[in-house]
Amino acid sequence: MADAAASPVGKRLLLLFADPTASASASAPTAAAVVSGDPGPALRTRAWRAGTVRAMSGAVPQDLAIFVEFDGCNWKQHSWVKVHAEDVLALLLEGSLVWAPRKDPVLLQGTRVPVAQWPALTFTPLVDKLGLGSVVPVEYLVDRELRFLSDANGMHLFQMGTDVQNQILLEHAALRETVNALISDQKLQEIFSRGPYSVQGHRVKVYQPEGEEVWLCGVVSRQDSVTRLMEVSITETGEVKSVDPRLTHVMLMDSSTPQSEGGTIKAVKSSKGKKKRESIEGRDGRRRKSASDSGCDPATKKLKGDRGEVDSNGSDGGEASRGPWKGGNASGEPGLEQRAKQPPSTFVPQINRNIRFATYTKENGRTLVVQDEPVGGDTPVPFTPYASATGQTPLAPEVGGAENKEAGKTLEQVSQGMVASAAVVTTASSTPTTVRISDTGLASGTGPEKQKGSWSQASGENSRNSSLASSGFGVSLSSLSQPLTFGSGRSQSNGVLATDNKPLGFSFSCSSASESQKDSDLSKNLFFQCMSQNVPSTNYLSRVSESVADDSSSRDSFTQSLESLTSGLCKGRSVLGADTQPGPKAGSSVDRKVPAESMPTLTPAFPRSLLNTRTPENHENLFLQPPKLSREEPSNPFLAFVEKVEHSPFSSFVSQASGSSSSATSVTSKATASWPESHSSAESAPLAKKKPLFITTDSSKLVSGVLGSALSTGSPSLSAVGNGRSSSPTNSLTQPIEMPTLSSSPTEERPTVGPGQQDNPLLKTFSTVFGRHSGSFLSAPAEFAQENKAPFEAVKRFSLDERSLACRQDSDSSTNSDLSDLSDSEEQLQAKSGLKGIPEHLMGKLGPNGERSAELLLGKGKGKQAPKGRPRTAPLKVGQSVLKDVSKVRKLKQSGEPFLQDGSCINVAPHLHKCRECRLERYRKFKEQEQDDSTVACRFFHFRRLVFTRKGVLRVEGFLSPQQSDPDAMNLWIPSSSLAEGIDLETSKYILANVGDQFCQLVMSEKEAMMMVEPHQKVAWKRAVRGVREMCDVCETTLFNIHWVCRKCGFGVCLDCYRLRKSRPRSETEEMGDEEVFSWLKCAKGQSHEPENLMPTQIIPGTALYNIGDMVHAARGKWGIKANCPCISRQSKSVLRPAVTNGISQLPSVTPSASSGNETTFSSGGGAAAVTNPEPDQVPKGAGTDGRSEEPLKAEGSASNSNSELKAIRPPCPDTAPPSSALHWLADLATQKAKEETKDAGSLRSVLNKESHSPFGLDSFNSTAKVSPLTPKLFNSLLLGPTASNSKTEGSSLRDLLHSGPGKLPQTPLDTGIPFPPVFSSSSAVAKSKASLPDFLDHIIASVVENKKTSDPSKRSCNLTDTQKEVKEMAMGLNVLDPHTSHSWLCDGRLLCLHDPSNKNNWKIFRECWKQGQPVLVSGVHKKLKSELWKPEAFSQEFGDQDVDLVNCRNCAIISDVKVRDFWDGFEIICKRLRSEDGQPMVLKLKDWPPGEDFRDMMPTRFEDLMENLPLPEYTKRDGRLNLASRLPSYFVRPDLGPKMYNAYGLITAEDRRVGTTNLHLDVSDAVNVMVYVGIPVGEGAHDEEVLKTIDEGDADEVTKQRIHDGKEKPGALWHIYAAKDAEKIRELLRKVGEEQGQENPPDHDPIHDQSWYLDQILRKRLFEEYGVQGWAIVQFLGDAVFIPAGAPHQVHNLYSCIKVAEDFVSPEHVKHCFRLTQEFRHLSNTHTNHEDKLQVKNIIYHAVKDAVGTLKAHESKLARS
């Protein structure tokens, strides 16, 4: 819930309803009047209604309503007011108490008292359809005179300590009483709603909105210290009512005034009991719920659950709670100068110091913080203070910038009692997407009256919500799916600014009613609403104080100048031109208007000619060219809005410059002439290549802090242009501009490559594609070398040592202070920054893209970001921050150049938004970790750009973009020019053949992700950080590339979680609350993270991923490697594919779009020219024996989701059956159906350019499935393919099914009742609701082609026997493969057993069985090991004193804190074993020992002994050539692949046969498990007979039994392993059995992953009879190594005491299962050990394919010779 300050209950309210008789534009004159400088009369004459909020209701913004008791009305006339009703024009909520200037005398007791200042209440707009802008509504006390002041000058916060003694108060008792009453009421509301107080036992009266009596009197019998809910015993009736003081007005009836300590009301500290803390610690912070989550209504519950996230004690500034101003007091705050002079009335943000947090560190290194019971229940709540809904209030830092903050500080100091007076005193829990209609200074006057369906309407709505949120309507806001926070809105929104023609300065209705609006669909986009506030004029206080020209004429001239400059845009030109060419260039659009927002605030020194600007219109989205976005929209300031040029989607982008970016030299009309200078599409690519973006040049050559002649001439340089910089970034990202950043991260080690790396042709190829990475990277452009005289050295990291106090007092950067921590958004921050300090002589050369160019020039360069999933390796050393060097800091301040954040948020700037990791640092239990470690863990490390304002205050400037990469960053992601180690030509082919399809699906998934990026959004680039694994904060899957990040806290979500949340209706999301499986963490102050507010971010720089995809297709075509990838642009089918001979007519299904023989881009995207592939691939014609003809390598603009698979055109086989074939018509029907549907799929470009097309509505066909265009794919359906077990399960057409013949059609888990899958079933497990042709045909074909499932077990058994015979014959045939490999066959010929673990040729025969998904046994490994190392006595002697946990295998009970010696001593001696309560010796197993990844460190000798002697080293060794995990560069966190030990006693008795040592489960990776020791226990009789019986009942085969009798070998454990494809059937059986036993089946649990089942003989029999599933029963003897395929369910039953050691690996054959399982594991609860994705399968696949492609490319000469 919300605190007092956040809740509107009990506050004064001003309402203005629409006059039904007035015209729609009636309010326009009001706005105009406001702009003209005298807002008072125009606004005062409206029919304002004042009253007090007595109650509120509504769980979602649309339903939010308040009960208002209007002044001067009787009780019957009081009513509920729907906050967002159409007739509500303005809703203003009480803010702070201030001293406001007053001209008219006050009438007191019949006498007129002239006063200069008078106490007044400020009001903050929650709903503002009038466009109040910077107007400050105030209501003077006593006479309640309402005034609208044009600015906050002359106002200052009422100080309780000193102002109570003010002469005016002492002289006028009525005023004094009014002030005291007001303060008292505010104190009471705070007491009721928050703080270390309890009103238990006090008499109160509760308001009854709709009761017969207005007030009910009673006594508080109980008040919850956390939720603040109180139980009131009603005096009259005696009933007990539960009252929430934040929703219903409660007043204290006691005469005494509550006091904080020792008064009538005592502070109550909440318990700090260990038990409470432990119970909370045990849960994942993300799933946490507050103590009282149950038992209250959903809205309350949600709010409580959302209570602040971690950072509620705001140490470094404002993180915990906002002062009233911050929240949104519209009341004026002193002007800049005034405030600077003001005494320490500056706010000190309220800090909730009473919140306690329990922390614990997870295995991945991430610290989770769980909010424990706050002391006294002083919890921050989601009610956000409201960051002024209309940017007018300095309170909204976003609006007022630092000044606001400072102002806020001033205000907040008020008195303890006044804490609650500000509507925003509380933490800003507002959601990040707050949007408001009128931003500071450019409040769009366009009210709803102007455009119902467009911008203003949307903004209006948002401004309402946001204001609500901030003002404290937070009640339901935190749970709203709608973003509500004001300042925060910006930073969370991506994309184009709302460019309504809005006014400059603080004008309000700047755009004339007649001006055309944007497309109405844009108005619905929250992003645009947010961006509408993203204006440069960030501080209306400073504007006012600087006498900002606010007359309408200036506005008109502004718009005119904007229009006149539309010709300035020239596409495709490099930003740095050689000379100025006057006149517009071709490609400019003359009729375009540039929004006023793109301009900084006008000040007298800011000539209007500076307004001649263009806003960027180009898109950076790799695949989306904005369908027909209104071209007026400027781009997201965070990342340049770029346009694609020629090749790469991310290559030379050009953003238009905005006026503010031009320097003083371009102030005149000459500015336009300079624009084209650097824009010529013909030159853009070459220039991009010639001029480096990252330059580690001599300090003397870098941009200097010298301000150009602008200063001397009196015209402002950019640094002096208002407070804000143009909100629209300009300048092509490809600009080779010198960056004051390092070319490589301080912690980054360059990838290990051969000596030829610098001349890497691949790198050059990529450079060409990206338009940047060329050899000239290290040379700076000549003009730069000449122009930049002042020295500047590369920046690294930053500390606060040299920071002056001014940074806290400086109003220009209030956005950076704590107060703005949540209410301010990055966009606004950027808008405020302006391009400070750029020499004017440089700006003249920056052209129309000046601002963007300047940004790059100033250092928006590469860098790395510290990721999310904090698992990391050994601490890394980070170089000294640049800010440790005073001279560098001075130069940075002079030049205003942006630089990368090179330290943790805490060390760099505590007053800026802190990332999640840095927020948690202060709560970590173990502070002794190295500072460098926490620095690298910072999520903004080398990701966020910072800049000093002209006042020397640090603020956020933006984030890196994908184009701002350097060769070192790119080298990590592209093939090395030299041969990769450990991979040869044949291995490369094999890897590509097995992994190429998965890689292609991965690329398709990334394209799908890019299509989800809105056209207006900009993609950021988060550089990989050495030793840190990027993880999704929701499902803990490793982030591969595209993901979404919160700009404020670094919260990141993967594609799947993002899509899942975005596709779900908001109402459903709110209802789910914390109980959903994938619940999202809150932002800094408990604000909800809304998908639309997150910033799309990629990890792989540039277009490397898509180019590797092209290379994969090219390589497979050139080398004749089989391919079955689903993308339409894939190469020809494998030459190995046999011709179909089943008699069905062979009709090619090549689509017209694929008919071109030329290769087109694999990654072609929306409107971009195709990326030129390094080498066009030529598929050899006639290759192979099937006579296939050449197939186009790629299809132009192939649909990203892939159309139906292209089939190679082959001539009909000689034995083709006649057309009269019984199935001929079915086959042709299916083919025709596929062709028709394929036609509709269209190319990627056409699909993406459909303006109305939803990101989910791509009509596409997977090679294996048709995805319903209306069904959002909840998970990586393209990635995973249609089934869990077989990527080829579903045919690309009915024809494939018909060709399969009886007995060949696999069964999918989705359709277990049908012998084969539906022809075009959806790849997501969506219930088929409509009968369709494929469904209908299923039944026909089932009867014609395939035998129905046999229900008769005897028949099934017979069928299986035949199948087994076939398998056995096939297996035996493998003997021919390598007669020299000693092996045998177990399990009736289904299990390969290799006898010589050291045979170098084992891998050949092993691979044939392994690729079939079969387990393999290798015997005799123990003969190679040093047996003395693996004996129980050795372990007991070396590690006996360690404390461990044991598990009782019989009942799964855990025995904690036992010495490991106790376990080992009873390993073979039963009498020494620990005993249970009934006195029986327990069957124990060691739990996680050695712990985690400690095996190698704890037992180095054993580690070496094991790794040297593992069989099949090609697969099992860490650097094995077929172990794909070895391809992952050391730069990344290596997956934990073991070894792990499994030590347990044997289960000997008959009763034990029903339990397992290790229950049924499966692993995401392949594994080899070696039995290194078998201990046969002594004492209490022999157990050999029982063991033999267990083996016999375990279905072991005769050959296995002979090993016991004839070979005298020691049996250790009985395994049951099942094929990965049978996992779903096993689940089905276990669910069925569970239901029979009355067990529940929660959604985040899985019968296999839960490891709660052991399949005993009865269950195994049922599985076989009911589902036809038969596994492998394997007895593992001493020295046997069992190879378990990834995804294969298996269980273990120890026959005797065993020591087993397992090592994991990733084989090419089973990568598809790794893919699928990673998705499965996402759905598990956090308690599952497999929940977290440690394998990083996508990264492994990427780098394996990258190395394979590089190797093949290096061997192409051989191909040419052959």
UniProtKB/Swiss-Prot annotation:
Compartments it resides in: Nucleus
Catalysed conversion reaction: N(6),N(6)-dimethyl-L-lysyl(9)-[histone H3] + 2 2-oxoglutarate + 2 O2 = L-lysyl(9)-[histone H3] + 2 formaldehyde + 2 succinate + 2 CO2
Protein residues bound to Fe cation: 1561, 1563, 1690
Modified residues (Phosphothreonine): 615
Cofactor(s) recorded in Swiss-Prot or TrEMBL: Fe(2+)
Enzyme superclass (EC): oxidoreductase
Modified residues (N-acetylalanine): 2
Keywords linked to the UniProt accession: Acetylation, Chromatin regulator, Dioxygenase, Iron, Isopeptide bond, Metal-binding, Nucleus, Oxidoreductase, Phosphoprotein, Transcription, Transcription regulation, Ubl conjugation, Zinc, Zinc-finger
Phosphoserine: residues bearing it: 493, 547, 557, 561, 767, 774, 779, 799, 1254, 1260
Composition skew (Basic and acidic residues), residue ranges: 299-310
Segments of skewed composition (Polar residues): 453-465, 713-746, 1146-1163
Covalent cross-link Glycyl lysine isopeptide (Lys-Gly) (interchain with G-Cter in SUMO2), where: 789
Pfam families reported in the protein's UniProt record: DUF7030, JmjC, PWWP_KDM3B, Tudor_KDM3B
E.C. no: 1.14.11.65
Cofactor note as given: Binds 1 Fe(2+) ion per subunit.
Zn finger (C6-type) location: 1032-1057
Low complexity composition-biased segments: 426-435
Positions of region (Disordered): 253-350, 426-468, 574-613, 713-763, 806-853, 1146-1217, 1285-1306
GO molecular function: antioxidant activity; histone H3K9me/H3K9me2 demethylase activity; zinc ion binding
Residue interval(s) of motif LXXLL motif: 1294-1298
Keyword Repressor carried by entry: no
GO cellular component terms attached to this protein's record: nucleoplasm
Similarity comment: family membership: Belongs to the JHDM2 histone demethylase family.
Function recorded in the entry: Histone demethylase that specifically demethylates 'Lys-9' of histone H3, thereby playing a central role in histone code. Demethylation of Lys residue generates formaldehyde and succinate May have tumor suppressor activity.
Domain observations: Leu-Xaa-Xaa-Leu-Leu (LXXLL) motifs are known to mediate the association with nuclear receptors.
Protein name, per record: Lysine-specific demethylase 3B
Organism: Mus musculus (Mouse)
Gene name per UniProt: Kdm3b
